[in-house]
UniProtKB/Swiss-Prot annotation:
Gene3D superfamilies: Sigma factor-binding protein Crl monomer (3.30.310.230). Keywords: Activator, Cytoplasm, Transcription, Transcription regulation. GO terms for biological process: positive regulation of DNA-templated transcription. This is Sigma factor-binding protein Crl. Belongs to the Crl family. The gene is crl.
């Protein structure tokens, strides 16, 4: 499958996977890509399958010469679902912002290497973290 960006999906998936453990292939559909990060474990004493995490997720789609994205910060619960939530702990917030900015920069650089831009989606007005200048 070739996306509207004229780049084959299989090659993009390989490039996205090379960015690290962020790509969730099972949640990528057609021209919709899903990335996430389980940045901070809430309780390490629980069995792994019962743990919850603070983190973030990004969804992106191709559009003429660019990818647009939306992202959220929140809780990855023990059922394996993301819920957008306000982060009250400043240390957790800092960790989420740091990992999100780091990933965003690497994603932006990777897309630039194939002559694509990375931009917020037109309807994404409530950005909790400023990712680029």
């Amino acid at each position: 499958m070739t996306l509207t960006s004229a780049h084959p999906k299989s090659k993009l998936m390989k490039r996205f996977a090379a960015l690290g453990p962020y790509l969730r292939e099972g949640q990528c559909q057609n021209d919709h890509f899903f990335f996430d990060c389980l940045a901070v474990c809430i309780n390490v004493k629980l069995a792994p399958e019962k743990r919850e995490f603070w983190g973030w997720w990004i969804e992106q789609e191709p559009s003429a010469g660019r990818f647009t994205y939306v992202y959220q910060l929140g809780l990855f619960n023990k059922e394996g679902n993301w819920n957008a939530e306000k982060i009250s702990d400043p240390e957790v917030q800092d960790k989420l912002e740091s990992t999100l900015r780091s990933f965003h920069l690497r994603l932006e650089e990777m897309l630039a290497s194939i002559d694509m831009k990375l931009e917020p989606a037109a309807d994404f007005n409530d950005q909790p973290v400023k990712l680029s200048a």
